[in-house]
Amino acid sequence: MVQRLDSFYQEQSIPQLIKEFHYKNKHQVPKLDKIVINRGLGDASQNAKVLESCSKEQSIITRQQGVVTRSKKAIASFKLREKMPVGLVVTLRGDKMYAFLDRLINLALPRIRDFQGVSRKSFDGRGNYSLGLEEQLMFPEIDYDKIDQIRGMDVSIVTTAKTDKEAMALFKTFGMPFKN
């Protein structure tokens, strides 16, 4: 099933970006490569229920099962042993990636209190964008009564853009709300 944002990209974003940046053909136009959603769960090493509930929440939000990240070495001051669970990662590609970005831009971000837009400074210099979300409640799929604790997540959007200017133009065509 073709996602709404994917068809919008094909029909409107590509011609607009070709006109703006004077690309020779449509294969030079930057596109989304993947979206990586990461959640660090510090207390998951002591409590298995935390890992289970966060995994369930993340799979509801992303509609894809996450991979548990484990510690690489033991750190006594954090009460952490080697290979203990410390987080969850989901990598979205294809239709699920476009569906998640569409829900993030049009449903989740507008639900944030006092939201004025996402930062323009979160580009990495190579056309990729990262943002941190402070709570999972901004997604309409998450029920307030069923969460045990408010936890955030990091969202990294990887594009094929060579510069931040190209990536920002791509995100603006998708309707990403940037601060002035």
Swiss-Prot record:
Subunit (UniProt): Part of the 50S ribosomal subunit; contacts the 5S rRNA.
Principal location listed in the UniProt entry: plastid
Lineage: Eukaryota, Viridiplantae, Chlorophyta, core chlorophytes, Trebouxiophyceae
Protein name per the record: Large ribosomal subunit protein uL5c
Keyword rRNA-binding listed: yes
InterPro entries from the UniProt entry: Ribosomal_uL5 (IPR002132), Ribosomal_uL5_bac-type (IPR020930), Ribosomal_uL5_C (IPR031309), Ribosomal_uL5_dom_sf (IPR022803), Ribosomal_uL5_N (IPR031310)
Function: Binds 5S rRNA, forms part of the central protuberance of the 50S subunit.
GO BP terms: translation
Gene: rpl5
Protein's organism: Chlorella vulgaris (Green alga)
Localisation per UniProt entry: Plastid, Chloroplast
Family: Belongs to the universal ribosomal protein uL5 family.
Molecular-function GO term, any one: rRNA binding
A GO cellular component entry from the record: chloroplast
Alphabetized UniProt keyword annotations: Chloroplast, Plastid, Ribonucleoprotein, Ribosomal protein, RNA-binding, rRNA-binding
